[in-house]
């Protein structure tokens, strides 16, 4: 891609974002990301926003359809359940295609060409995120593989972030937010999720005075999401304990709601 066409692709991606045509935004930013040159911060963020929007819409659709499927199943409506199942699988295929698309770009281009610690953390976090999205709906060996790869991405990002980025850095905080959601949602490890979220929050609080003005808003937003998740997960644990004692069914019915990512999502992720 020439310098001019790269500039054009970025401009068209911004235009697509304004028009809320996120598939077009993805195509333009994917062409920029595939040049084997380090992306600027702006380009990196445009790429993230593009994929986040196309995947976010389908994740929300999948949750709604899955919820309806469960309700129809409980009513014994077999014919409707079959129709819903086919529709859900169609959404899952779209989710799989999008995730595989960005994961290929990350593995072939972005991660190998990342020079700065910030970029490396950002891309390894994305690897963790998109394998996590696959693990949300996959079953059996595919779910295990997706969970393993997600963990690998988050761990690689965490090692670099801990060594190179300040505890108040928005990317490090966003990583902690998403990694803790991974432990809670995918590995069913609420204790580990709470530990990770609390550690990130406490470390950031202790260095709040050193927070730069430009990242203050982003950092404090993610810190609030970390705290919100801790509150939610703690109340979930208390309710589960009470429910177990009282033999109440349906104690764990808090589905994740959507919110911005890196950016962020309650059981929020960033």
UniProtKB/Swiss-Prot annotation:
Chain intervals for the UniProt region annotation (Disordered): 242-270
Write down any Gene Ontology CC term. cytoplasm
The record's InterPro entries line, in alphabetical order, gives: 14-3-3, 14-3-3_CS, 14-3-3_dom_sf, 14-3-3_domain
Major subcellular site: cytoplasm
Instruction: List localization entries.
Output: Cytoplasm
Name the domain of life this protein comes from: Eukaryota
The record's GO molecular-function terms, alphabetically, read:
protein sequestering activity
Cite the entry's keywords alphabetically: Cell cycle, Cytoplasm, DNA damage, Meiosis, Phosphoprotein
Q: For this chain's UniProt record, which GO biological process terms are given?
A: cellular response to heat; meiotic cell cycle; mitotic cytokinesis checkpoint signaling; mitotic DNA replication checkpoint signaling; mitotic G2 DNA damage checkpoint signaling; negative regulation of induction of conjugation with cellular fusion; protein localization; signal transduction
Q: Return the SUPFAM superfamilies for the record.
A: 14-3-3 protein
Q: Which residues carry this modification: Phosphoserine?
A: 34, 66
Any single Pfam family the record assigns to this protein: 14-3-3
The record's note on quaternary structure and interaction partners says: Homodimer. Binds preferentially to mei2 phosphorylated by ran1/pat1. Binds preferentially to cdc25 phosphorylated by srk1 during G2; the interaction is increased during osmotic stress. Interacts with byr2. Interacts with rad25.
What's its job?
A: Acts in cell cycle and stress checkpoint signaling by sequestering signal transducers regulated by the checkpoints. Required for the DNA damage checkpoint that ensures that DNA damage is repaired before mitosis is attempted. During environmental stress, sequesters srk1-phosphorylated cdc25 in the cytoplasm to delay the G2/M transition. Sequesters byr2 in the cytoplasm to prevent its translocation to the plasma membrane. Sequesters ran1/pat1-phosphorylated mei2 from its non-coding RNA activators (including meiRNA), to prevent meiotic induction in vegetative cells and to regulate meiosis I.
Question: What protein family does this chain belong to?
Answer: Belongs to the 14-3-3 family.
Q: What is this protein called?
A: Checkpoint signal transducer rad24
Organism field: Schizosaccharomyces pombe (strain 972 / ATCC 24843)
Q: Which gene underlies this protein?
A: rad24
